[in-house]
Each structure stands twice: as structure tokens, then as C-alpha cells.
Amino acid sequence: MQVFQTIHPCCCGLDVHKETVVACVRRTGADGTIDQELATFPTTTAGLLGLGDWLVERRVTIGAMESTGVYWKPVWNLLEGRLELMLVNSRDVKQVPGRGSTELAEVKTDVKDSQWIAQLLASGLLRPSFVPPLPQRELRDLTRTRASLLQDKSRTANRLQKVLEDANIKLAGVASDVLGVSGRDMLRALIRGDRSPAQTADLARGRLRLKIPKLTEALSGRVSEHHRFMLRLLLDQVEQYEQQVSKLDQRIEEVMSPLQKTALQMLDEIPGIDRRAAQNVLAEIGTDMSRFPTSSHLAAWAGLCPGNNQSAGKRRGGRLRQGNRWLKATLNQCAWAASRKKDSYFAAQHRRIASRRGVKRATMAVAHSQVCVCWELLKNGQAYQDLGPQYFEKLNEDRTKRQLVHRLEKLGYTVTLQKQDAA
């Protein structure tokens, strides 16, 4: 008995694993009869090319697979262009009702999984994930690798700081950046062990030289040979990470297309978003905003909007939706930077929400606004124009007057308002 309406008469469900791919070709006749053909292929290049030939011979026009780790990528790369492909979230496949009442629920096997994917695809019940073109996927690899290396560098710097604390070197309490130019000179002097604390402190540069007495006291620790070995090892690791990040920066600039570089300049104008962050954003969302009908769709895809929690006509606070964690992390950092930029709309928005809902919610709200601004700029190709720090006060002048009068009255003042004539 046919349960679902047929949208794709000839399609294929792919159950992808590390070493094998199980394919189920599903054909639905005009009279509703269903014919299924199953085959298993290795995930070697020859095996996947054979899978493509097998599907083309059977005139399959569309196939679907779950986003299983990184194992789906070789399958997608070799089948892309030969037929329409759909990558779906495993959660969406499991949450579709109906499998529990069919014979597919009796035993869970790779064959049953491929048949279920094919059945959902044939019925049009699968929601495709956004898979960008190959150049953008390669740019993503570069930006995500750079982000991972920067995280590794931060962790290594924290380990280095722990070694300094173990040696009772309080350099971080005096110098704002232990890994700055002055800080590294002092670290190398500590590693060599050929200078007194006063001589090491004398390596300070710029404004840090005003703190030489404090530096001398902070550098008077007990540095053993073990500490020197660990400091040398960790400082070398930090410098290696910096060299690798520099190579990635250069490579990212090389592979970006002229269109992406134009978009990069537009995003770089947004407060809180620097060039590196703009590269990360473009690598995740691309320049073609037709994939996202509205800015709200993009915000939801990025995981920067609350989930739905509504009952009896009342909306309650909900947890953030799952989304693109790389894009969310980048925009969270950008939102925090924007909140500290004076005389900007985002800073005013952050202050306004933080006073009522807290800093974390305010930062997330600014990140939501930033991703919506990114969509508007990329969609319309227009330059960024800041609304200004007075936007919310001008938006509701009466409320602003009431709030200010109330604050003065609480201090014991009697307030009389008189509007000035325009000059």
C-alpha cells in the first residue's frame, strides 16, 4: 500500500559509511507500483565512479544522503554534476513520522536506512541542507582551519602562562600582552637564563618602560631548567601556529574571487567585523543570497534566533536554535567587539538590551542584527550606513522622556518639560 504521495518517480537513497555506500533506487509506476533495486559500493574512487555509472544507467535524476561526518564529501564530490544531489540532516530523517508503522521499522540495517531515505525523497519529505559550490567549500576549509589554529594558539598561550605562574613569574600582571614584542623578548631572556630580573625588565619597549620597577619585581621568580624547557617548547609552538596562520591568510587572499573581494569590502564596513571576520562570514554564507529568502532565514540558519516556544497566544523565551557553529562563533566575537565601539547603533542596542536581559542575550541580539545587515548588504549591493547611537531614543521620543523624567523625580527633582523652538 502506498502511504505517501510521489514527487520523484525515480530517485535514489544513499546510506553512506566510511568504507561502503548502500544505494537504493526507487521507481514508482503510474499505477502506484513500487520497484526497488539495491546495491553496495566501496567508497574508493573507483567504487564511487562505479556508483555514478550505475545510477546514470538507471536514469536516476535525484539522490539523497545524510550528512554523516565527513564521509559524505567524497560521494558528493564525485557524483556532483552527474545527477541532482540532496544532503539532509540526520535529525530530520529520523523525525519524519511513519517509519514506525512500516516494515522498515522491524530491523535497522544499512539497506533499511537507504530504503527509508529513498521513500522520503520520493515523497518530497526531505529538506535539503545548504551545500555551497566547490570554490566556496575550499574557502571554508581554509577559514575553518585558520580558526582552529587560532584556538590552538590560544590554548598553548594559556599553557605557557601556567608555566610562568608555576615559576612565580607575574609578567601577566604587569604587561597586558605576554606574547607582545616586549613580552617575547623577556620570555626568551628567561629561557636563556643569562639575565638578572632588572636586565630582563630593561628589555621593555614603548609605554611598558614606565613599569620597569614593577616588571623587575614580577620577573623575580624561581625559573628552573624544567621551566625553561617548557617555555621554549610552548613559545616555539605559538610561533609555529602564527606562521601557519600567516600562510592561510595569504592563501585565502589568493583564492578569493573579485566578487568575493568586493563583498569583503562591504562587510568590512560593519562595526565589529574586521577583514578576517568578513572572510569567515563570506566562506560560510557566500555572496549569493538567493538561498536565503529573507534575512530572518539566514539568521535562523546561523543559529542566531530563538526557537519557537508559544502557547495560548503567548511567546516565551526559547533556547537558541542549532545552526552553523562556525558562523555563530565568528559573529559572537564580532558582536562583542561592536558593543565596545562607541557612537554606533550596535553599541546602543547592546546597552539597551543588556540593562534588561543581561550581557549574553544582548550580545546574541547584536550578532543577530549583524547577520541581518550582512544579508541586506550582499542582497542589495549597498554600502553600510550606521543608524547612530541616538536611534532608539528618536524611535520612541515619548518613552525616552518618561524614562528620563522618572529618573530625575526619583532623585527628588520636579521636572517641567518645555520644547525648544527649532533654530
Regions found by a protein language model. Name each.
Residues 1-423:
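A detector of single, family-specific signature residues
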